[in-house]
Design a protein with these regions (language model features):
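Secreted, periplasmic, or luminal enzymes acting at the cell surface/secretory milieu
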Residues: 2-3, 7-86, 92-94, 149-153, ...
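Short, hydrophobic/aromatic beta-strand segments
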Residues: 84-91, 103, 135-136
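Terminal connector regions
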Residues: 128-167
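Intrinsically disordered, low-complexity Pro/Gly/Ser/Thr-rich segments with frequent PxxP/GP/PP motifs
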Residues: 99-135
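Short, conserved secondary-structure segments in the cores of folded domains
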Residues: 61, 109-111, 139
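Intrinsic-disorder/low-complexity, polar/charged segments enriched in Ser/Thr/Lys/Arg/Asp/Glu/Gln
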Residues: 70-72, 120-124, 159-161
């Protein structure tokens, strides 16, 4: 059978289930603008710099937490260019299954750092149940148990991932 690839295309949207790949499905569900792509030109959080940065070693200090606990997500950012520069490290979280449809990505934190050429820095984000809350069908502000995906990167499109479970 044929295989279908579904990708996240915009920041903070809900998953439509529509494929982005070329072919018959793409022609059926593509935008009506024939002179531009479906992909946005710049992803949310995109920025320019006079230097380059790399992200590595995304890790969580725990693989699960309770609604009373917290966990820490860390990433190592390295200035791989020849100039000193600033970078905004962004934290996104995705609730994989919820009682109401959840966005494919939500910006939950960011930190601006300055690195000299060749310098590395470990950046940490504290993830609490408060960051996972949303309004359910009854308009209660709740966090529900389940699987979550943590994404850390330089924009909504360029991220490194880790996962945890809320018990």
């Amino acid at each position: 059978g044929s295989e279908m690839c579904i990708r996240d295309r915009f920041y903070n949207h809900k998953n439509t289930g529509r494929p982005l790949a070329d072919g018959a499905w793409f022609q059926k569900f593509r935008s009506n603008y024939i002179d531009i792509d479906n992909e946005p030109l710049y992803p949310f959080g995109f920025g320019l710099s006079y230097t380059t940065f790399s992200y590595s070693d995304v890790a969580l200090d725990k693989t699960s937490m309770t609604d009373k606990g917290e966990l820490t997500a860390t990433v190592t950012v390295t200035n791989t260019g020849k100039r000193d520069g600033a970078e905004v490290v962004q934290l996104y979280i995705r609730d994989l299954v919820g009682s109401v449809t959840r966005p494919v990505k939500e910006l939950k934190g960011f930190e601006k750092i300055f690195l000299k050429a060749g310098e590395s820095k470990k950046v940490s984000f504290k993830i609490t149940p408060e960051l996972l809350k949303f309004y359910n069908y009854n308009l209660d502000f709740v966090c529900e148990p389940g699987d979550f995906e943590v994404m850390i990167g330089r924009s909504s499109r360029d991220v490194k991932k880790a996962a945890f479970k809320l018990l």
